[in-house]
Amino acid sequence: MTMAGGRRGLVAPQNTFLENIVRRSNDTNFVLGNAQIVDWPIVYSNDGFCKLSGYHRAEVMQKSSACSFMYGELTDKDTVEKVRQTFENYEMNSFEILMYKKNRTPVWFFVKIAPIRNEQDKVVLFLCTFSDITAFKQPIEDDSCKGWGKFARLTRALTSSRGVLQQLAPSVQKGENVHKHSRLAEVLQLGSDILPQYKQEAPKTPPHIILHYCVFKTTWDWIILILTFYTAILVPYNVSFKTRQNNVAWLVVDSIVDVIFLVDIVLNFHTTFVGPAGEVISDPKLIRMNYLKTWFVIDLLSCLPYDVINAFENVDEGISSLFSSLKVVRLLRLGRVARKLDHYIEYGAAVLVLLVCVFGLAAHWMACIWYSIGDYEIFDEDTKTIRNNSWLYQLALDIGTPYQFNGSGSGKWEGGPSKNSVYISSLYFTMTSLTSVGFGNIAPSTDIEKIFAVAIMMIGSLLYATIFGNVTTIFQQMYANTNRYHEMLNSVRDFLKLYQVPKGLSERVMDYIVSTWSMSRGIDTEKVLQICPKDMRADICVHLNRKVFKEHPAFRLASDGCLRALAMEFQTVHCAPGDLIYHAGESVDSLCFVVSGSLEVIQDDEVVAILGKGDVFGDVFWKEATLAQSCANVRALTYCDLHVIKRDALQKVLEFYTAFSHSFSRNLILTYNLRKRIVFRKISDVKREEEERMKRKNEAPLILPPDHPVRRLFQRFRQQKEARLAAERGGRDLDDLDVEKGNALTDHTSANHSLVKASVVTVRESPATPVSFQAASTSTVSDHAKLHAPGSECLGPKAGGGDPAKRKGWARFKDACGKGEDWNKVSKAESMETLPERTKASGEATLKKTDSCDSGITKSDLRLDNVGEARSPQDRSPILAEVKHSFYPIPEQTLQATVLEVKHELKEDIKALNAKMTSIEKQLSEILRILMSRGSSQSPQDTCEVSRPQSPESDRDIFGAS
C-alpha cells in the first residue's frame, strides 16, 4: 500500500530545463553557456560534445561558449567575429566553421547558437549545438583515396551524419525515405519561442494527457466505483434468478454502464501514473504500454455487451443461458476498486463505508448462490415431481403461495413465492449466518444446502471477525508505515505552526518529507543494515552504490575489498528542488556524486555550472592538506539523488589502499571544484561602468558664484602668492646690486631696508608670521669681502666659514657668481691638475625629514640656512681646500654645483607644498560637497566656474631644466 500523499507523485515545481534539452537532443552535441558573464563561460556540456571534441567535461567547463580554445591557424577570422557578434547581440544564428579537436585534428562544424530565456524574458543561457560536416566540406576526389577506399570513406561519412545530411538538404522529395533526425535541430530551426525556458515550473503534461490526481479524474474514479458496485450487485442477481432483460429501461441503463466503462478504458490510455521512483509518468507511450501490460485485457472482457444478445426474441435458450453466465465476467470490474483502493482510503469515512459495502456484497453473493441451490433441487426434471424438503417449498407453504403442477398447459410446476420474496428471504438467511445469529426460521434440509450453510458460517465468522472485530488492529498492522508517515506529517505541521515558519519554507519542508518518504517508503535503511551482519551489510552497500562504481572510471581498478570499504562509507542523500547542498563560505567536507536529477552552481548570483547525472563536485581532499571553504552555492533544480562520502572516511580508505589511491587520484576528475573561485566580470557591470564613464565625461564643469566662500579662499591664496613673488623679486634686485657695486652694498642695503623687510605670508596650520630677509642681506657683505681676499686668514683649516653658511641658497648662488670673477684668473689646465678629490664620506650629506614646522613645510637636519656649516671646507667650495693650494677650480663646475644644490632644496620645498595643497584640496572638495547639498536650491545661472589654484610646482626656477 502506498502512502497517503504518494499517489499524487512528486509534483513540486522543478527546473527541468536540462532534462528537456537532453530528451530532445537525440544524440546532438551541445553546450550551455552563461549569457550574463563576460566571455559566456560554459556551464554544461553533454557527452556527445565531449566525445566529438576530445575534451573532458571538466576541461571545457568555464571556457568560452564561442569555443575559442578550439580555434586554430585555419579558423576563419571573419566567422569568429560573426560568432562573437551573435553572442553579444543575443541572437539566433548558425555558422560553418573550421575548429580543432583536443589532438589538434581540424574538423568542420555546423554550429547553431540559440538564446535561452527565463520567466522574466531575460537571456540567461546560450544553447550551442555542433554537427560534424567534415565529410561534406572535404572534396570527394582525393588522390590518397582511390577506388573502393574512396567510396567506403564517403559511405561511412554519410551513414554517421544522417542528421546533418537532412539539415543541409532540407528540400527532400516527398516520396523519398528520410531518416528521423534530432528534435533539437527542429526546435532550433523553428525559432526561440518554443525553446524551453530556464525556470522552475510545475510538471507539465501534454494536452491530451490527464493528470491522475486532478479533480475531473478523482470524480470520475468515484463514479466508476459506484458503477462497479452496481455491476457487482446486478450481475449475480441476473445470473441466479435467470432474468432476461426484456425491460427496455434496464437494458438502456446497462448499456449506458457498459459505455461508461468503455470510456474509462479510453481514459486509462491518456491518464498519468506514478512510477516506481515516485515520479509522475506523462509520456503517452509509457502510459499505453503500462496499461496494456496490466489491466487492459481484464477491463475489456468486463465491458463486452452481453445483454444485447439476450435482448433478441428468437435466441436459443442455451445460447442465452451461456451469455447470461458470461455476465459474471463483469465482476472483474472489481479490479478497478482493488487497484485504486489506496485512492479511496485517504478519506476516513470512506474506509468504513467500503468495509460495510464489502460485507453486504458478500451477503448478496451468498444469497444468490443460496437461491440457485434451492431452485436447482426443488424440481426433479426426470420424475416431474417436487421435493418437499427444499427450503423453497417450505417458504412457499409458509407465505401461502404453494407450487402447482400445470398438467394441461406447459406441463411444469408453477406458482410459488415471488422473486422479490425469495431474494429477501435468501439475503436474510445469509446475513444471519454470516453474523452467527441464526434464528432458524429458514434452515437447510438437503445435503447441498447444509454444506453451503457450513461454508457460509465459516466465511461469515472470518468476515465478521476481520471487518468488525479487529478493524483497528488490522489497520495498524497493514498501515503501520502510513500511520507513522501521518504521525510525522502532523508533528512537522505542528512544529511549523508553533514556530511560525514562513510559508515558502514550510512548503519546502513538507515537499521534502513527501519526496523522501516516496523514495524510502518509510524504511529506515540504517536500521535495516544494522540488523545484517558485516559481510552482508557490505554487499548491500555495494549494490546500493553500484551506479557510482560503474559510471566513474576512478573505481575501475579498485579491488573488491576496496569497493566494499568505500561502499560502507557512502551515504545516499535525497534533495528536493530548491535545496542548498552547499552554502558559500561553509566547509567542503564531502565528495558528492550525482546519480539522478540536476543541480546548479551559483557564484555571485550567477550560474557558473549546471551539474547532471554522472557529475562529481566537492574538493580534491587527496591533494589538499587543509579543509576548503565553498566558493559557491550548490542548489538542486529537480529532485536529486546524491551519493556522498565524507572527507575523513575517504582519506582513511585511500591511506589503507595505497595502490588504489594513486589510480583514484589520477582518474577522478571533478566536474566542479568548490575550493576554486571563478574570477569573472558580469556583462551588466561592464556596461554600467562604461555608462558611468561616459556620464562623467559629458558632465558640465562645476560652476560657483563669484562670492562663494571657496572662490574667495582661492583668491586669498593668489594674493599671498603674488606677495611672495614680489618679495623674491626685490631680493633678486638687491643681490644684483651687490654684484655690480661691490663695497657699496652696505649703503644700498640701508637705503632699501624697508624693502628687505618685506614679508611673505605662507599657508600653514598656525597663524601666518612674516619671514624676514634681513639675515640674508646682512650676510652678503661679509661674503663679498671674503671673496675679494682669497689669501686671507679665512682660508685656513680652522676657518669655519660661519657667515657664508648662514645664507639662503639664492644668496649663496650670488656669492658664487662674485667668486667667479677671481676664479677666472686661474687657468683651466692648472686647475684641473691640482683639483683636490672630495671625500665620499663628507659628500653624502642628505636631507632627512623630521618634525613639521609652522609653515607646514618639512624641514631637515640640514637646514637651508645652515647648509654651509654642515659641510667640510672642500664641499663648500674648492677655494676652501688646504692652504697649500693657492689656486681655484674652474668657475663653470662651481656654478653648476651651486645651481644643483639650490635646485634640490627648492624641489624639496615644492614637494612639501604640493602635499599640503593636496590635503587642502581634499578638504575643500568636502566643504564644496556639503555647501552644494545645502544650496541645491540655487539657480544654475548664479554659479560660476571654480578653477584649481596654480600649483607651486608650476613656478619652477628657470634652472630646473638643468
UniProtKB/Swiss-Prot annotation:
It is a multi-pass membrane protein. Its main location: membrane. Residues 672-674 are annotated as: Interaction with cyclic nucleotide-binding pocket. Detected in cerebellum, at parallel fiber synapses on Purkinje cell spines. Detected in hippocampus neurons (at protein level). Detected in brain, but not in the other tissues tested; expression is highest in granular cells of the dentate gyrus, in hippocampus CA3 pyramidal cells, and in cerebellar granule cells. Detected in pituitary. A motif (Selectivity filter) lies at residues 436-441. Glycans are attached at residues 388, 406. PROSITE patterns: CNMP_BINDING_3, PAC, PAS. Residues 646-743 are annotated as: Calmodulin-binding. Residues 897-937 are annotated as: CAD (involved in subunit assembly). Signal peptide: none annotated. Channel activity is inhibited by interaction with Ca(2+)-bound calmodulin. Interaction of a single pore-forming alpha subunit with a calmodulin chain is sufficient to promote channel closure. Channel activity is not regulated by cyclic nucleotides. Channel activity is inhibited by binding intracellular phosphatidylinositol-3,5-bisphosphate and phosphatidylinositol-4,5-bisphosphate (PIP2), but is not inhibited by phosphatidylinositol 4-phosphate. SMART domains: cNMP, PAC. InterPro entries: cNMP-bd_dom, cNMP-bd_dom_sf, Ion_trans_dom, K_chnl_volt-dep_EAG, K_chnl_volt-dep_EAG/ELK/ERG, KCNH_animal-type, PAC, PAS. Residues 1-220, 270-290, 342-350, 472-962 are cytoplasmic. It is found in: Cell membrane; Nucleus inner membrane; Cell projection, Dendrite; Cell projection, Axon. Residues 93-145 form the PAC domain. Residues 151-162 are annotated as: Required for phosphatidylinositol bisphosphate binding. Homomultimer. The potassium channel is composed of a homo- or heterotetrameric complex of pore-forming alpha subunits that can associate with modulating beta subunits. Heteromultimer with KCNH5/EAG2. Interacts with ALG10B. Interacts with RABEP1. Interacts (via C-terminus) with CTTN. Interacts (via cytoplasmic region) with Ca(2+)-bound calmodulin. Belongs to the potassium channel family. H (Eag) (TC 1.A.1.20) subfamily. Kv10.1/KCNH1 sub-subfamily. The segment S4 is probably the voltage-sensor and is characterized by a series of positively charged amino acids at every third position. Conformational changes of voltage-sensor are driven by an electric field generated by a potassium gradient across the membrane. The C-terminal region interacts with the cyclic nucleotide-binding domain and contributes to regulate channel gating. NCBIfam families: sensory_box. This is Voltage-gated delayed rectifier potassium channel KCNH1. The lineage of its organism: Eukaryota, Metazoa, Chordata, Craniata, Vertebrata. The gene is Kcnh1.
